[in-house]
C-alpha cells in the first residue's frame, strides 16, 4: 500500500551517481609474425589507442538549510602505445617454451572519473571523483613451459613479472585548512 509511505527526496543518495559520460577510443594494431628457424618463431606487434572522454556530474553542497547543485564538467584525452614481443621455441612437437614482453592498460571505472563533488558541511566531509585519473599501465614479462601428453592433456609451468604504474586507489585525507576529510 503506497499510501502508507511518505515520499522523500534524498538527493545525497542519487545526485552523485547521476552523470553523463562519453568515451571514444580509436585504435590500430600492427603485427609481424616470423619463423626465425624451424623451432623458433616470433610475433611482434604494437597497438596504439587514442582516448577522448568527457563527463558531466554534479557538484553538491549540503548546507544547513539548503542544497546547492551545480554541474561539474571534466574532460581528458590521451594516447597509449602498447608494444608486444612474443617468442615460441618448440623443443619437440609436444613441448615448447614461450616468452613474452607485453604492455597493457586498465582504464578507471567510469564513476571514478566523474567530476562529482559531494560536500557535507555538517559531517565536514567531501567526496569527489577525479576526471584526471590516468589508466593503470603495466609492462609484463612472461615465461611459460608447456608439455603436451596425448593421454592426459597438458602440463605447464610459468613465471611472470609485472611493473604496474598509475595504480588507482581510494584515499582519505584531512585538509588542515578546512578541517574536512
Give a label for each model feature.
Residues 32, 85, 99, 143, ...:
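Hydrophobic, well-ordered secondary-structure elements that form the walls
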Residues 39-42, 94-97, 151-155:
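Repeated loop/turn-to-beta-strand initiation elements of outer-membrane beta-barrel proteins
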Residues 11, 57, 163-181:
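Surface-exposed, extracytoplasmic segments of Gram-negative outer-membrane nutrient-acquisition systems
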Residues 13, 17-26, 76, 105-164:
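Outer-membrane beta-barrel signature, preferentially recognizing the C-terminal barrel domain
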Amino acid at each position: 500500500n503506497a499510501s502508507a509511505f511518505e515520499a522523500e527526496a534524498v538527493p545525497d543518495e542519487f545526485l552523485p551517481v547521476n552523470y553523463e559520460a562519453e568515451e571514444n577510443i580509436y585504435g590500430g594494431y600492427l603485427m609481424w609474425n616470423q619463423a626465425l628457424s624451424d623451432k623458433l618463431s616470433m610475433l611482434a606487434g604494437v597497438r596504439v589507442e587514442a582516448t577522448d572522454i568527457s563527463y558531466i556530474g554534479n557538484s553538491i553542497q549540503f548546507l544547513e538549510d539548503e542544497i546547492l547543485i551545480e554541474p561539474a564538467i571534466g574532460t581528458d584525452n590521451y594516447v597509449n602505445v602498447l608494444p608486444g614481443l612474443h617468442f615460441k621455441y618448440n623443443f619437440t612437437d609436444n613441448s615448447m617454451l614461450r616468452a613474452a614482453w607485453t604492455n597493457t592498460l586498465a582504464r578507471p571505472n567510469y564513476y571514478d572519473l566523474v567530476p562529482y563533488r559531494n560536500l557535507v558541511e555538517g559531517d565536514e566531509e567531501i567526496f569527489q571523483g577525479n576526471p584526471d585519473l590516468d589508466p593503470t599501465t603495466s609492462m609484463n614479462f612472461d615465461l611459460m613451459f608447456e608439455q603436451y601428453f596425448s593421454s592426459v592433456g597438458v602440463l605447464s609451468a610459468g613465471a611472470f613479472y609485472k611493473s604496474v604504474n598509475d595504480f588507482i586507489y581510494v584515499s582519505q585525507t584531512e585538509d588542515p585548512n578546512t578541517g574536512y576529510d
